[in-house]
From Swiss-Prot:
This is Cerebellar degeneration-related protein 2-like. Belongs to the CDR2 family. The keyword Zinc does not apply. Residues 31-154, 201-264, 342-379 form a coiled coil. It comes from Danio rerio (Zebrafish). Transmembrane segments: none annotated. Keywords: Coiled coil. InterPro entries: CDR2 (IPR026079).
Amino acid sequence: MLRAGRMDEFVTEEDEPWYDQRDLEQDLHLAAELGKTLLERNKELEDSLQQMYINNEEQVQEIEYLTKQMEMLREMNEQHAKVYEQLDVTARELEITNEKLVLESKGSQQKIDRLTGTMEMLQGQVDTLTARVEELRTLEELRVRREKKERRKTVHSFPCLKELCTAPRYEDSFMVSDPGSGDLEECQPADEENEHLRVMVSSLRAAVAAERGRREAAERECAAVLQEFERLEQRLLGAESCQRRVHELEAELQEMQQLRKSRVCLLSGEEGLEQTLLNCAPETDTPDEAVMAQNGDANDGAAPVRKSCSDTALDAISAVDASGRRKGSYALHANGVRKRGMSILREVDEQYHALLEKYEELLGKCRRHEESLRHAEVQTSRPVSRDPSMKECRVAEPQQPPPTPPQTPSTPEALEGISRQVEAVDKRLSQNTPEYKALFKEIFSRLQRTKSDINSTKGRKGGK
């Protein structure tokens, strides 16, 4: 009879609820709030992804525009290179022509110097001959005057008249005697030499005039060459300015290439960020993992110290999520490689629906786990002992009146056992935080990190 009383106390103790309804409601409210927060965060991520798509399209258009500009600059550079080649060829030809003209000008200058020396020498000869002619003229005048004086003296003498009558007639009235005829014979070679000198002087003057004309022509050619040289210098300055412009365009092209490389790096960084966002998203459980979780839940239900239904379910799911997240990330990467054309918004939407399904499945697992725990309590309350007296007690149980309300245990052993169980549960709850809290904390930290990365990339774009 005493044994039957102890069995009744054990049954009443096992019939008491092992969890608190408030804890369950608080867990459900917390899960609902977290789901709402995740929905809001999902909307924000959708907006940010749309903005990223718009920015990506703008950057693609800008890259196309820059590529077109690069092609135009490349064509302009090629045209400038062709012009520079032509200018180089023209400059070389002009340098050769300039060298030839310089040599010709030097030769003409030497010739002019020689002709100038010849002119000076001839001018000296002309001066000497002119002085000699003047001297001969003075001598001739003196001789004529002397003859006139002599003729005046002898004009009234008879022999002179006889000589005049007998002498041959001369056209020159002043030459009336033989000595005068000798003077004329001496003057004829002087006149011939004088004529010859006059001819030489006239020829020299003609040569000097011709040389002066040639000199003026050479001076005009030198002036034309100098003008051409100045024009070539101006063209050379223009070519140097064009060369500087080409260097500036090359520097701008290098800057544009560096800017393009930096933008490509930024675009690749944003793609990596999107990939990390997708990889960090939770994945759905496989059926095998669900079975393993249910088996784990059943084993946990048999433990002497039980967790709440949400704690045990989330422990099982988080234990499965460690491998499922890795497999899911690999599967997501493979799907991303196979279906690169799929939109990221669609993937996020699918992940959101998968998260909702996972949440509903979590609630279903909690309910199933609660029912399994109830069945386990009923099963553990029955096989207490294999004594035939217990069978008699079980047969006699339907004949007993309904059980009385539960009473507080009166024995010290029962009190000590209950206190030990309560202390163990408190110690476990104080040491081990629930797994879902750590999971949600990790999710929020990753969301904040992605938001800070997006803001930093936008700040870098704005700074550039």
